């Protein structure tokens, strides 16, 4: 099965299934000398893990990470880092009714046709449980980026179903179960998600991800443009169906006189580009939006077929997120971090000696 490795110089290969013994990743290319412990990784895993509120899956996983290699006396050695997260709360009996049938909206049908076999327990490899390994790897990348450049990566939910969430400050993100940068709408969101769950249905979500203190010059035109790689990374997250960089689709209604970010000696006057021009970072904040589809596993009966092509009616039972987007913020942060560290290392490898006389204006306007 190809497609399990991400990156070129900082590579991450994930392994494991939803109901297997565990999952994890191998990180190769991490620079030596980075102080690293399980606690550095655990923080983001705890933000992503299931069972943290009534609005997400009630599967209870500790998601405790183990560092098996690549770290000696508290610092990375430059050799492969192996990270393991053991599964402890599998309930595979919940999936007996889908062993020979295909859930609408899931990867069951496509995995079966591609591989001729599939692990139907919780979706197997196609489950969003796999993203725990990405979050673990992303935590390592985030730590290196912060120490090297002061880079800070933040993600928050801006819409759940038809409920748009006003931005009131990033300090609120960690204080509610919705990863919302908002305080005043939390009770409304609680009631909304309760009604969605009781209706045996699900909703989608929209998230905003931003990276501050990104150095100018990251990105490899023409095929490995920074924005292209960010879009690739975000689309690789389960259930993501759309990506915007900067003004995104709003660019269609803007005039060139508005969209093009003007430059002055004091800095850029706007950031419609989302911090990327010509596929290369400008040094401004990078801004990304992603759209996540409604969770496909719902208890409402729906039409499908079995592996023999016979029509059936199927309801998916078990422990599922009524809005999978509510736990996507740490995953999106991780994927952006993995793109940035890979491009930082690629830039250093080829362009470390490049110097220009033009003053750096990029950080004066976010």
Swiss-Prot record:
Pathway recorded for this protein: Metabolic intermediate biosynthesis; chorismate biosynthesis; chorismate from D-erythrose 4-phosphate and phosphoenolpyruvate: step 7/7
GO biological process entries: amino acid biosynthetic process; aromatic amino acid family biosynthetic process; chorismate biosynthetic process
Cellular component terms (Gene Ontology): cytosol
Annotated keywords: Amino-acid biosynthesis, Aromatic amino acid biosynthesis, FAD, Flavoprotein, FMN, Lyase, NADP
Binding site for NADP(+): 48, 54
Matches recorded under CDD domains: Chorismate_synthase (cd07304)
Cofactor note: Reduced FMN (FMNH(2)).
Gene Ontology terms, MF aspect: chorismate synthase activity; FMN binding
Principal EC category: lyase
Residues binding FMN, per UniProt: 125-127, 238-239, 278, 293-297, 319
Reaction catalyzed: 5-O-(1-carboxyvinyl)-3-phosphoshikimate = chorismate + phosphate
EC nos: 4.2.3.5
Cofactor: FMNH2
Superkingdom, taxonomy of origin: Bacteria
Family: Belongs to the chorismate synthase family.
HAMAP family: Chorismate_synth
Function: This reaction introduces a second double bond into the aromatic ring system.
Subunit text: Homotetramer.
Protein's UniProt name: Chorismate synthase
């Amino acid at each position: 099965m190809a497609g399990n490795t991400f990156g070129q110089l900082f590579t991450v290969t994930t392994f494991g299934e939803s109901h297997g013994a565990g999952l994890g990743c191998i990180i190769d290319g991490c620079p030596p000398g980075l102080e690293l412990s399980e606690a550095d990784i655990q923080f983001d895993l705890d933000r992503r893990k299931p069972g943290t509120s009534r609005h997400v899956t009630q599967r209870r996983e500790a998601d405790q990470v183990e560092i098996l290699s690549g770290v000696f006396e508290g610092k990375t050695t430059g050799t492969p880092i192996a990270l393991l997260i053991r599964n402890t709360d599998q309930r595979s009996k919940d999936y007996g009714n889908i062993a020979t049938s295909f859930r609408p909206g899931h990867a069951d049908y496509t995995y079966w046709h591609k591989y001729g076999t599939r692990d139907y327990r919780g979706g197997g490899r196609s489950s969003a449980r796999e993203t725990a390994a990405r979050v673990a790897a992303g935590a390592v990348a985030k730590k290196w980026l912060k120490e090297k450049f002061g880079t800070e990566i933040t993600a928050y939910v801006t819409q759940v179903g038809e409920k748009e969430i006003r931005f009131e400050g990033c300090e609120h993100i960690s204080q509610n179960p919705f990863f919302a940068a908002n305080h005043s709408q939390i009770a409304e969101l609680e009631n909304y998600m309760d009604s969605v769950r009781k209706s045996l249905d699900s909703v989608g979500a929209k998230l905003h991800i931003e990276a501050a203190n990104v150095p100018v010059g990251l990105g490899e035109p023409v095929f490995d443009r920074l924005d292209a790689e960010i879009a690739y990374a975000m689309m690789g997250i389960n259930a993501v169906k759309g990506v915007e960089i900067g003004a995104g689709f709003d660019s269609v209604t803007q005039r060139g006189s508005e969209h093009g970010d003007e430059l002055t000696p004091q800095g850029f006057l706007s950031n419609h580009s989302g911090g990327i021009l010509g596929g290369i970072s400008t040094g401004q904040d990078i801004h990304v939006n992603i759209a996540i589809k409604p969770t496909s596993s719902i208890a409402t009966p729906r039409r499908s077929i079995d592996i023999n092509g016979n029509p059936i009616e199927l309801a998916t039972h078990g422990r599922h997120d009524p809005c999978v987007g509510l736990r996507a913020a740490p995953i999106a942060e991780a994927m952006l971090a993995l793109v940035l560290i890979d491009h930082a290392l690629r830039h250093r490898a080829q362009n470390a000696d490049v110097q220009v006389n033009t003053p750096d204006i990029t950080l004066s306007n976010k």
